[in-house]
Amino acid sequence: MQILKVIGLLMEYPDELLWECKEDALALIRRDAPMLTDFTHNLLNAPLLDKQAEWCEVFDRGRTTSLLLFEHVHAESRDRGQAMVDLLAEYEKVGLQLDCRELPDYLPLYLEYLSVLPDDQAKEGLLNVAPILALLGGRLKQREAPWYALFDALLQLAGSSLSSDSVTKQVNSEERDDTRQALDAVWEEEQVKFIEDNATACDSSPLNQYQRRFSQDVAPQYVDISAGGGK
């Protein structure tokens, strides 16, 4: 399902090269994911700088629209590290190499990985993260961000019954984390944590600091890319 890599490129921070190759991208979308034709046309015909600014407003403000998959499953749990290692091992099996700036659970990267698998395995991989895709799509749709269409398209390609509309009730009950007040609260919390960490750094070993960091963590459900996911 090579179209998954194209969808991943449309999901990433807008890149000049994609704008230069917009006719090729549109041709692939029309052929393999026609439900995204309007989205792709509107995206790639808009000024690049405008879309870059809009992308940052959508995906860089708060965690609830993060494109890091495990942010929505493990958050800061210690299980997140092992999940990263497991996913990285899956990438290495198909020859996918990451550079030092990439995290294995970055959704466009995961889509690139799925794009080299047989179609049935690629669909299974999408189904394994279908609840996350639906939730992200629902949050983006609530914020009137056009990228929600990408998540609905992925769910359609996977054959999932979920969509951005299927999580409307949950999304409406959530407190948004992209408001000025929410962002200020996160900043203040990080400042307090920074001060506390520095206060104990002189008389604590790295191991003790690590244990304190995770002492209150819980272990959320793991998104297993090798098992069947929600439909």
Swiss-Prot record:
InterPro entries: DMSO/NO3_reduct_chaperone, NO3_reductase_chaperone_NarJ, TorD-like_sf. Its main location: cytoplasm. Keywords: Chaperone, Cytoplasm, Nitrate assimilation. One of its GO terms (biological process) is nitrate assimilation. Pfam families: Nitrate_red_del. It is found in: Cytoplasm. GO terms for molecular function: metallochaperone activity; unfolded protein binding. One of its GO terms (cellular component) is cytoplasm. SUPFAM superfamilies: TorD-like (SSF89155). The keyword Chaperone applies. Belongs to the NarJ/NarW family. Chaperone required for proper molybdenum cofactor insertion and final assembly of the membrane-bound respiratory nitrate reductase 2. This is Probable nitrate reductase molybdenum cofactor assembly chaperone NarW.
